[in-house]
């Protein structure tokens, strides 16, 4: 198990990267007003955060989590495996 927080790339910072059991999980966390905006997963995709981890040859899972500012609860949890 290897966990890295605020992992820097040439295009920004990955909120959390986890290498576990032959898989890589990249997390982006966003706070939104009320409803899901899809920005967390979109940031992982558009900034190419997975490129830093392709060298390991392991499955990579992009996980976008959005929290409601008012409810302080998860309003979206999007996953894409690449």
Where are these regions (language model features)?
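Active-site metal-binding core of divalent-cation-utilizing nuclease and nuclease-like domains
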Residues: 1-21
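Composition- and surface-driven signal marking solvent-exposed, interaction-prone regions
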Residues: 5-8, 29, 40-42, 60, ...
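Short, flexible loop/turn elements at secondary-structure junctions
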Residues: 9, 20, 31-33, 66-69
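Structural beta-strand/beta-sheet cores of well-ordered domains, especially the beta-sheet scaffolds
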Residues: 12-14, 25, 58, 63
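Conserved catalytic cores of phosphodiester-cleaving nucleases, focusing on short active-site segments
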Residues: 16-18, 22-33, 47
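C-terminal, active-site-flanking charged/polar segments
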Residues: 22-24, 37, 45-46, 75, ...
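Mg2+/Mn2+-dependent nuclease catalytic core
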Residues: 32-50
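Domain-level recognition of nuclease-like catalytic cores that cleave nucleotide substrates
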Residues: 52, 56-82
């Amino acid at each position: 198990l290897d966990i890295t927080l605020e992992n820097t790339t040439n295009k920004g910072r990955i909120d959390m990267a986890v290498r576990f059991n032959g898989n890589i999980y990249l997390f982006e966390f966003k706070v939104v007003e009320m409803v899901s905006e899809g920005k967390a997963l979109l940031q992982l995709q558009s900034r190419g955060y997975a490129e830093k981890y392709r060298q390991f040859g392991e499955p990579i899972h992009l996980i976008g989590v959005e929290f409601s500012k008012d409810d302080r609860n998860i309003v979206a949890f999007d996953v894409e495996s690449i």
